[in-house]
Amino acid sequence: MKKITKILKRKFKNFNPKLKEECGVFGISDNQDASTLSTLGLHALQHRGQEGCGVVTFDGKKYHSEKRFGLVGDNFNKEEVLKSLPGNFAIAHNRYSTTAGTTLRNIQPFYADTNTGGIGVAHNGNLTNAITLRKKLV
């Protein structure tokens, strides 16, 4: 491992071998239990973010979203998830904030209905080209 780290430090100027953990992101597609499985995935990633959590599902016609402050296990139970998050596609996110305030609005995933359909997004980090993406998507 030391040899690999040495090579990477030489090749990549800003290489840092220390583990950096930020938000947890989980996705699942084409499964009738997508919301339940995605919350289980978030539970497994809980160590990556404990500020808030959210799930966005898509049922083929409409997006559904639940976002809450706190831990996954405290906010999502199977009955609740199945009722409010129908669909065969889901993305889920645990928040560990590095920028922006601690508000419900900043908990991911984000989704939007646009003139070309819709989109759901969860990311681990900062979108450095957010303005460009917005112009192309909205």
Give residue ranges: language-model regions.
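N-terminal glutamine amidotransferase
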Residues: 1-131, 136
